[in-house]
């Protein structure tokens, strides 16, 4: 799925610009995403608001803006809907025998986006399939790629000429 961490960061940067007239960098957007990024507007264990400090985009004077997970959930929703659409499309193209395995075992979320508060719950509720966050989501794709490259005989279907 091509929607993920960088798209979320762009959404946060645009949101802070439009909503708060604040200019923030990609690393600041990443910190916001990691601390208060959420896929749901209501969480059982909500993170505390994050104080974001940055320049006013017109005056360059400092701004101190408290940002809540609800606010970030709202600004990320469009891209999360794209993820949901891609999952739906993928499930629709999945052979029935593999589909049964997916329903039985669930789907593992990887990458930085997997760490969004409430993402696994939102997807589980929507698709009625258990979504899990991988043990090490930031490195699991690289580890899986290494495993596949070390065992090309078992994973030949992943290699294109």
Label every model-predicted segment.
Residues 12, 87, 109, 145:
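Residue-level signature of catalytic and energy-coupling elements of molecular machines
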Residues 8, 28, 32, 72, ...:
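General structural feature for long, well-ordered alpha-helical segments within catalytic domains
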Residues 121-147, 155, 159-161:
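Conserved phosphate-binding/catalytic loops in two-lobed NTP-binding clefts
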Residues 16-24, 36-43, 91-94, 127, ...:
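Conserved NTP-handling cores and scaffolds of large molecular machines
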Residues 1-77:
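Phosphate-binding glycine-rich/basic clefts of nucleotide- and phosphate-handling proteins
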Residues 41, 99-123:
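Glycine-rich phosphate-binding loops at beta-strand->alpha-helix junctions
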Residues 75-103, 148-152:
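Phosphate/ATP-binding catalytic cores across multiple sugar-kinase/actin-like superfamilies
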Residues 1, 108, 112, 134:
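Glycine- and other small-residue-rich loops at beta-strand/loop junctions that grip anionic moieties
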């Amino acid at each position: 799925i091509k929607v993920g961490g960088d798209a979320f960061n762009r959404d946060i940067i645009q949101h802070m610009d439009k909503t708060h007239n604040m200019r923030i960098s990609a690393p600041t957007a990443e910190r916001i995403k990691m601390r208060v990024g959420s896929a749901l507007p209501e969480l059982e264990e909500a993170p505390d608001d994050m104080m974001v400090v940055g320049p006013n985009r017109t005056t360059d004077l400092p701004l101190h803006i408290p940002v809540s997970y609800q606010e970030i959930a709202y600004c990320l929703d469009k891209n999360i809907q794209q993820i949901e659409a891609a999952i739906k499309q993928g499930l629709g193209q999945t052979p029935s025998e593999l589909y049964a395995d997916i329903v039985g075992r669930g789907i593992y979320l990887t990458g930085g986006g997997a760490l969004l508060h409430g993402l696994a719950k939102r997807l589980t509720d929507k698709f009625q399939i258990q979504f899990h966050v991988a043990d090490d989501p930031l490195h699991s794709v690289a580890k899986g790629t290494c495993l596949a490259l070390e065992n090309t005989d078992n994973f030949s279907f992943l290699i294109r000429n």
